[in-house]
């Protein structure tokens, strides 16, 4: 059990424990083509290359694969091969990654390209490659499926995939055919970056879909341009998602929802779309924030009983904004400030619409709009602007293994200082970089990992829960400047009750100066942490796996986008022997005084005391929180929270569950949102799901958890929208002690058993 607030030595001798690999056989016959992009120019063959240490002695497994320009037939093998004549393991999301670099060119394929878990398709941002559907495309009418085939219909089990710097082209397929460019029935730790989808124009009400989101559990999709076709994005069974910076161009329908639960759309544009946003079924929560409608039809329309909001919409023509069941509720308007329709606390009757004016504080929304900062592709930088942390020729003649065998904290700290002083991007090849003391990210840092390169905490330094220490510290208290990190994973090797996995201590001058994009914070459940798994086998004596996942300390102001914080205590994600591990973890946000803290979106699941703790926080915007209550809590729990921990209410703002009877196991379940004071809290979608009521025990409708969102003390200016739940008696507890009972007018979202507080503002 981790007491976490949820989120990398020694100089080595001349000999290395990691053998120098032979060139991967699959690279034989590959023609090298000149490019200025850093990634293919890194050393992917010799000792500084990426290395997977948890493959039972397979020292030559190739992280990196590439193909000849234009060779579409080679792409599938590049994804699936294990480099020695076999195939990669299905559903391993941390230990056997693959990055397929695609040089510039056009790659025509005639059947669906299918991903394994832990796969990144990496194009060249200087000249993005085109993956094109052949005119004679056969089989499933889908160009790319990012879902691991071994998960069958359960897309929520298909983790860790990404597509970067790629164009998907379906224009050779007739426009009236049903065809999908990208099937995105996937789960967390998935992302898109700098992707363009171009389709044939629709015909007769039929046509192509850019991205179809079937059954799955994604956090965020961002930086996509989707052109023409019938549907830009079709949500067809997804649990939740947050969208940022999506450009819909000439789609018949921009974003279609036919099945799903909780969604938010930020900083997106509908340009020359027939209809921007129709919903056909169910009652999903939808938040449309800072959107633009250009030369497009109705913005939001539904034939259902909706639950949605629109805030800060600009629109340039005379078509209606909102049409519900044939009636125009918001007519043509050049600007909509704040309009919501749904279950509203304080409204009589509860269900209906509210029009209001919401003035965002300038610290949170400079110029009136929430900031959006895309993760850099670094396509504009030459290879000389990068420092490979494993390459002695670049890192000051230091030796780094990245194989989880020795403490590399001191060495890596020196290397990161060197990179920052030289204004270079620090590149971490895939590996496990063990640190037995804090890895400090200095001011001036830019860091990019290969395939979620992993920093793993280890040792006695992180074992004192009375003096918790960060595994990774982003800056130091009082620092102001730049520290930008992406594509990393931070985890632990052992039971570390004093480990704060990631702590943000510094602030930036501008939004995104201090940032973490497309990364993971995990504890347990994967290979390479056998000591932790073996120590955590007793459901009646939960182990204290770590202290906090990500801690945003006083004075810091990070920009956190698409980060999944997961305590894999209650199941094993990769096949190895060992127990399940149960810990206390949490996100904890201290008082924030500078600029905005942006959570765009975040996933926090299976932690013990709570999923997100906003403790006296100020100036925070959450586009979406995806939260899952720990599977071992509830009516069948073997140890009642806060045990085995002692709640620290004063210092860390822990919930102590003192409002519950001592034996009330449904009451003593960690909340999704735990909000305690503060000011200027804007949260637009919370997808909070309770799936189990203790080990092996499922949930009855509305009866799994007593209360899933908890306000201990009401912040000044709390703007809370789309607080959704699954199988909770009460969806929300207010700061004055009032409980918002789900079945008393607040159902919606998840079907059946779902709750939806569309609006609660103070």
From Swiss-Prot:
It is found in: Secreted. CDD domains: GH55_beta13glucanase-like. InterPro entries: Pectin_lyas_fold, Pectin_lyase_fold/virulence, QRT3-like, RHGA/B-epi-like_pectate_lyase. Keywords: Cleavage on pair of basic residues, Glycosidase, Hydrolase, Secreted, Signal. It is an enzyme of class 3 (hydrolase). The keyword Secreted applies. Optimum temperature is 40 degrees Celsius. Inactive at 55 degrees Celsius. Residues 1-16 form the signal peptide. Its EC number is 3.2.1.39. Inhibited by glucose. Its main location: secreted. It catalyses: Hydrolysis of (1->3)-beta-D-glucosidic linkages in (1->3)-beta-D-glucans. Residues 17-33 form a propeptide. Does not seem to be glycosylated. GO terms for molecular function: glucan endo-1,3-beta-D-glucosidase activity; polygalacturonase activity. Coiled coil: none annotated. GO terms for cellular component: extracellular region. Pfam families: Pect-lyase_RHGA_epim (PF12708). The keyword Transcription does not apply. Belongs to the glycosyl hydrolase 55 family. Involved in mycoparasitism, hydrolyzes yeast and fungal cell walls. Classified as a small-oligosaccharide-producing type based its the end products: glucose, laminaribiose or laminaritetraose. The C-terminal cysteine-rich region may function as a fungal cell wall binding domain. This is Glucan endo-1,3-beta-glucosidase BGN13.1. It comes from Trichoderma harzianum (Hypocrea lixii). The gene is bgn13.1.
